Curated annotation (Swiss-Prot):
Name of the protein in question: Calcium-dependent protein kinase 1
Keyword terms of this UniProt record: ATP-binding, Calcium, Kinase, Lipoprotein, Membrane, Metal-binding, Myristate, Nucleotide-binding, Palmitate, Peroxisome, Phosphoprotein, Repeat, Serine/threonine-protein kinase, Transferase
Annotated GO biological process: protein autophosphorylation; protein phosphorylation; regulation of leaf senescence
Membrane is among the record's keywords: yes
Family that this chain belongs to: Belongs to the protein kinase superfamily. Ser/Thr protein kinase family. CDPK subfamily.
Length: 610
């Protein structure tokens, strides 16, 4: 699922590392092999073993990348470079289907790199029995009929697993992009899980202004259909080709957007793993159009201190620790650093005639700041690139440190503090709501599908250390510390008490989901109406004090003053709450009711875009 196309696509770096040929090192180099060399040899064996017998050591015929404006179908490609390109457009490509990379993550640290593996025949993949014919085999739930709501238009792009079409919502006439994934191409259980995880992560990141939004997922006998917002402005990659390179001011602006997405993803426990210019689309053709991140097919949920070992990504952008098969979210910052280099110069920082050579350069090559246009680029820009492309991930800048760098700052003003983890920031928001709104969020949370809350479930499991299904004060304290939160015990206790709506002394799974749910979920009319209907027990169209009291009893909410809750929401003072008043309460800013300390409200001024 690593090649999602949402809009027209003519990309030059569109091939996963897993399909690369890694040739053995010459014998006279062996004496000087470093740890990185040994690791690269280990990668060599693994990658070689996954290639088909048809792949040869000789280079394939070249296919020159089409110039902007040429109408070609987007395909997965292997990358070859003949010589250092003057522009991205001079990079030659091989038109060839991608080999699927096995994507199994490991969290156990390894004492030393794997020894070089000998070439061997490719492994046979385990097929899912009748995967392309089994209803509900992918989404694991019954969905509505996609064709009843949307009509398909022209094709926008083609990937290994799916084809993206323009689609129109029949009731509104609004245009969206629909990625249709053929179920017959999902050959393994892992392929199916990749699709599920991609959908889960898109829901988890929903609400960020620079992440493409998912409207819904549908499944029929032959395909899974992902309906997303349509970005008609084309790829960042294409604009780089058209320009050659960006001005420093514009490059810094784009860097803020790209790295801002990385910081937000990491705060939500998501690692993208395939950042490249092709995976950023402009909403429109306008010069100042909003930029959106797409394609979460290789993305993974991660916990602090997790170590991943599967080699995925795209050759020019892959971090050295990924090739060494021991990495974490820092790899995303490396990839973003490569993009910054390209924005400024128009060419990738690490290039070679073969993919093996590209990887060698990634592991050992020097950055070129002497060729044009680098002599005319500021020292501050070069300093940032150097610090983003440090090979030791422990010494590399974090996403927040990049945003604080003088070259990236807006008018010399850095962000005041890193983004809180999603758990902390959302619990702070929840803590300032009155109990009526908390109960309403609980109702909405219980109506969401598993794929919509899968990311929050990962977070709950990370904090619930003893797997009891209940988060204790000590577990919440330890969990927040793991994600970098530095709070006093009194502040943690305030959050605990705010989320513990039924006053049980712990936070159960449903309370946690309600407390950490992104508030964009309450923008949907169907969610709002379902929640209102829950409280309107007699179906009169109004919520009365007695009905609100009954709801409090059902949720185990005690020590609540019904009159005060009603007065906060009842705008026309008729002693009852109609639907419009209920919606106004749900959609306006946090309402400070209940025992939560007002000091927590200062955190809401953080420019949090999750």
């Amino acid at each position: 699922m690593g090649n999602t196309c949402v809009g027209p696509s003519r990309n030059g770096f569109l091939q996963s590392v897993s399909a690369a040929m890694w040739r053995p090192r010459d014998g006279d180099d062996s004496a000087s092999m470093s740890n990185g060399d040994i690791a690269s040899e280990a990668v060599s064996g693994e990658l070689r073993s996954r290639l088909s017998d048809e792949v040869q050591n000789k280079p394939p015929e070249q296919v020159t990348m089409p110039k902007p404006g040429t109408d070609v179908e987007t395909k997965d490609r292997e990358i070859r470079t003949e010589s250092k390109p003057e522009t991205l457009e001079e990079i030659s490509l091989e038109s060839k289907p991608e080999t699927k990379q096995e994507t199994k993550s490991e969290t156990k640290p390894e004492s030393k790199p794997d020894p070089p593996a000998k070439p061997k025949k490719p492994k046979h993949m385990k097929r899912v029995s009748s995967a392309g014919l089994r209803t509900e085999s992918v989404l694991q739930r019954k969905t509505e009929n996609f064709k009843e709501f949307y009509s398909l238009g022209r094709k926008l792009g083609q990937g290994q697993f799916g084809t993206t079409f323009l689609c129109v919502e029949k009731t509104t006439g609004k245009e969206f992009a629909c990625k249709s994934i053929a179920k017959r191409k999902l050959l393994t259980d892992e392929d199916v899980e990749d699709v599920r995880r991609e959908i889960q992560i898109m829901h988890h990141l929903a609400g960020h202004p620079n992440v493409i939004s998912i409207k819904g997922a549908y499944e029929d006998v032959v395909a899974v259909h992902l309906v997303m917002e349509c970005c008609a402005g084309g790829e960042l990659f294409d604009r780089i080709i058209q320009r050659g390179h960006y001005t420093e001011r514009k490059a810094a602006e784009l860097t803020r957007t790209i790295v801002g997405v990385v910081e937000a993803c990491h705060s939500l426990g998501v690692m993208h793993r395939d950042l490249k210019p092709e995976n950023f689309l402009f909403v429109s053709k306008h010069e100042d159009s909003l930029l959106k991140t797409i394609d979460f097919g290789l993305s993974m949920f991660f916990k602090p201190d997790d170590v991943f070992t599967d080699v995925v990504g795209s050759p020019y952008y892959v971090a050295p620790e990924v090739l060494r098969k021991r990495y974490g979210p820092e790899a995303d910052v490396w990839s973003a650093g490569v993009i910054v280099y390209i924005l400024l110069s128009g060419v990738p920082p690490f290039w070679a005639e073969t993919e093996q050579g590209i990887f060698e350069q990634v592991l050992h090559g020097d950055l070129d700041f002497s060729s044009d246009p680098w002599p005319s680029i500021s020292e501050s820009a070069k300093d940032l690139v150097r610090k983003m492309l440090v090979r030791d991930p422990k010494k590399r800048l974090t996403a927040h440190q990049v945003l604080c760098h003088p070259w990236v700052q807006v008018d010399g003003v850095a962000p005041d503090k890193p983004l809180d983890s999603a758990v902390l920031s959302r619990m702070k928001q929840f803590s300032a709501m009155n109990k009526f709104k908390k109960m309403a969020l609980r109702v909405i949370a219980e109506s969401l599908s598993e794929e919509e809350i899968a990311g929050l479930k990962e977070m709950f499991n990370m904090i619930d250390a003893d797997k009891s299904g209940q988060i204790t004060f000590e577990e919440l304290k330890a969990g927040l510390k793991r994600v970098g939160a530095n709070l006093k015990e009194s502040e943690i206790l305030d959050l605990m008490q705010a989320a513990d709506v039924d006053n049980s002394g712990t936070i159960d799974y449903k309370e946690f989901i309600a407390a950490t749910l992104h508030l964009n979920k309450i923008e949907r009319e169907d969610h709002l109406f379902a929640a209102f209907t829950y409280f309107d027990k007699d179906g009169s169209g109004y919520i009365t004090p007695d009905e609100l009291q009954q709801a409090c009893e059902e949720f185990g909410v005690e020590d609540v003053r019904i009159e005060e809750l009603m007065r906060d929401v009842d705008q026309d003072n008729d002693g009852r709450i109609d639907y419009n008043e209920f919606v106004a309460m749900m959609q306006k800013g946090s309402i400070t009711g209940g025992p939560v300390k007002m000091g927590l409200e200062k955190s809401f001024s953080i420019a949090l875009k999750l």
